[in-house]
């Protein structure tokens, strides 16, 4: 019976061991278990562009300085009937005034008159400027100012169409640009307001 | 020693005790318990309506101005552009995004009512852009074009999924700020999830 007792003790120890093992496993599992993993997240942003522009702008040209140009001495022959002959003032002989516009056009550069911002696939935008039909003349009655050669620029490049940076939607990341255009005063004979010139800016995501 | 059992009965008792010890031992994670973390979460595309615009192209007219011009064509002094607000917001939300779930086997005594008393959670989230920056999603082709992203954990909710299964859901709210995004298209990031159960 001693053997049997001892045998029982051994078996009981085994039972305790098994019980202990089971409890220990449960504690290990139940005490603190940590699992980790990752989930990839994808968000999709739409294309969007904002063009800021002036709907109207007025250029006030400075008043040319009035001048009296002394063309020098001249002697003319005058008949008794009152007819004078000799040197006369002509286009070729007129002295230059401070302002001369013959054969030239005035290129007007207006910085920061448009701005763009938004999102595009490439992060860029195309900005184009055109003169619509009838928009190439500023008129005051018969007096006209011709408008031509209009360009957009962004401080780095200039042209009728440019590819420029589209820096995002925030105002602080907007791209600013200017306009250049030529004005022809050769058919201008009136002072005062000449109206009717137009340009159209188009901004597109690319 | 009259009361001593025969060896065969002793063996049966041992087996019974072993089974009893297993049943009585506290169980927190059975083999039937399954944690599932979703590998990919494709969020609904951000719409123009969410930004507060009706069209993908907006023209914003500025107040007219007058400027002095010189005859020699020098740069005209134009006023500083005061840009109007052209959209409503740059903040976008995606709520109740399901990232993971835990299935518990009801055979271990779990019920919808007691699952929280038996399983306490601590869940940590970390969102990292493809460019490696934390709290960002980055554009697929331009690492400098980013969406600022913040994640907010929602309380774990459990429901009975079937007769033998209780499912607990790990959902989050995602808040995005697109003011630093430059490009349209897809932005990528990874959410690291660490779930600790007590």
Locate predicted features.
Chain A
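Detector for intrinsically disordered, low-structure N-terminal pre-sequences
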Residues: 14, 26, 149-151
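Short, surface-exposed beta-strand/strand-loop-strand elements in extracellular ectodomains
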Residues: 138-155
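N-terminal small/polar-rich segments of proteins
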Residues: 26-142, 161-206
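Bacterial N-terminal signal peptides that target proteins for export
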Residues: 2-12
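N-terminal signal peptide c-region/cleavage motif recognized by signal peptidases
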Residues: 21-23
């Amino acid at each position: 019976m001693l053997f049997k007792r001892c045998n029982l003790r051994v078996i009981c120890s085994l039972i305790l061991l098994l019980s202990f093992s089971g409890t220990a496993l449960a504690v290990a599992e139940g005490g603190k278990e940590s699992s980790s993993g990752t989930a990839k997240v994808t968000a999709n942003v739409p294309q969007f562009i904002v063009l800021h522009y002036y709907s109207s702008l007025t250029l006030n040209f400075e008043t040319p300085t009035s001048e009296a140009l002394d063309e020098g001495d001249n002697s003319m022959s005058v008949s008794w009937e009152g007819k004078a002959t000799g040197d006369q003032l002509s286009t070729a002989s007129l002295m230059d005034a401070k302002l001369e516009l013959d054969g030239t056009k005035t290129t007007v550069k207006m910085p920061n008159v448009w701005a763009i911002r938004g999102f595009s696939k490439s992060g860029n935008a195309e900005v184009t400027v055109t003169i619509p039909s009838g928009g190439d003349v500023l008129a005051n009655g018969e007096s006209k100012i011709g408008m031509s050669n209009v360009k957009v620029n962004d401080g780095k490049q200039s042209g009728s169409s440019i590819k420029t940076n589209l820096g995002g939607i925030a105002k602080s990341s907007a791209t600013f640009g200017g306009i250049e255009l030529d004005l022809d005063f050769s058919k201008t004979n009136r002072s005062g307001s000449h109206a009717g010139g137009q340009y159209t800016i188009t901004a597109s995501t690319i | 020693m009259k009361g001593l059992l025969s060896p065969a009965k002793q063996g049966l008792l041992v087996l019974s005790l072993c089974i009893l010890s297993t049943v009585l031992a506290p169980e927190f994670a059975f083999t039937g318990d399954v944690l599932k973390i979703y590998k990919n979460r494709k969020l609904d595309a951000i719409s123009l309506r969410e930004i507060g615009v009706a069209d993908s192209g907006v023209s914003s007219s500025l107040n007219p101005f007058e400027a002095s011009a010189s005859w020699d064509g020098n740069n005209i002094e134009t006023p500083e552009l005061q840009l109007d607000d052209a959209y409503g917001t740059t903040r976008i939300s995606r709520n109740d995004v399901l990232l993971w779930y835990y299935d518990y086997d009801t055979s271990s005594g779990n019920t919808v009512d007691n699952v929280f008393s038996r399983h306490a959670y601590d869940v940590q989230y970390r969102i990292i852009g493809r460019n490696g920056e934390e709290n960002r999603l980055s554009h697929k082709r331009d690492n400098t074009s980013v969406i600022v992203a913040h994640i907010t954990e929602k309380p774990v909710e459990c429901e009975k999924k079937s007769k033998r299964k209780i499912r607990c859901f790990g959902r989050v709210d995602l808040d995005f700020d697109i003011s630093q995004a430059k490009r349209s298209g897809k932005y990528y990031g990874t959410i690291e999830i660490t779930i600790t159960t007590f």
